[in-house]
Amino acid sequence: MTDNDDRIKLEASWKEALREEFDKPYMKQLGEFLRQEKAAGKVIFPPGPLIFNALNTTPLENVKVVIIGQDPYHGPGQAHGLCFSVQPGVPTPPSLQNIYKELNRDLNIPIPNNGYLQRWAEQGVLLLNTSLTVEQAKAGSHANAGWQPFTDRVIEVVNERCERLVFLLWGSHAQSKQKLIDPQRHLILKSAHPSPLSAYRGFLGNGHFSRTNKFLEQNGKTPIDWSLPDL
């Protein structure tokens, strides 16, 4: 997996910031792992051109908010490279349904009929999974494939190069990345995960979306319009 791979495009600001990562042994091993998995007939999500969609949709200089997920959805047609988001025409997954419930409670935002979060990403919400690929029907299957050093570096880059961001850390996996974030520079908001297993243990009622926008406005930034159009 090299940054001149014709199938894998990376937005210019991220390519510059992450250039050294693509030459490191772990990244070469990761690329070889993915090639071998595909050669063995395994179905990998998301499709190759969408693996870096979070970075390509939200250039480094545009980042205002970071939401950290775990790995892509593992069902056909769901994942498109943005954490918690699904492609148009796909039913809204349970965790995202709870995110919408909290948005509705917190900011009175109508619940859309889809789970397509592209509009958030275009406004500066970096929707970053810590593993950028997964095997079909096998959640967490690429958790140890080598993505962690890469996505850790993404978090380090936004921590170092951006000012006054909001990091939304939902659940223990996302919160394990807190050590990469400077709390003097950025606002870190933590709660339970929006999964149905944990949403009622502190996610619903966390007020993270209004708190995010208040912080952005206090720091001279345009708040996020969290509303999404019906499709």
Swiss-Prot record:
The active site is at 71 (proton acceptor). One of its GO terms (cellular component) is cytoplasm. GO terms for biological process: base-excision repair, AP site formation via deaminated base removal. It catalyses: Hydrolyzes single-stranded DNA or mismatched double-stranded DNA and polynucleotides, releasing free uracil. PROSITE patterns: U_DNA_GLYCOSYLASE. The keyword Transit peptide does not apply. It is found in: Cytoplasm. Pfam families: UDG. The keyword Thylakoid does not apply. Its main location: cytoplasm. It is an enzyme of class 3 (hydrolase). One of its GO terms (molecular function) is uracil DNA N-glycosylase activity. Keywords: Cytoplasm, DNA damage, DNA repair, Hydrolase. Its EC number is 3.2.2.27. Excises uracil residues from the DNA which can arise as a result of misincorporation of dUMP residues by DNA polymerase or due to deamination of cytosine. Belongs to the uracil-DNA glycosylase (UDG) superfamily. UNG family. This is Uracil-DNA glycosylase.
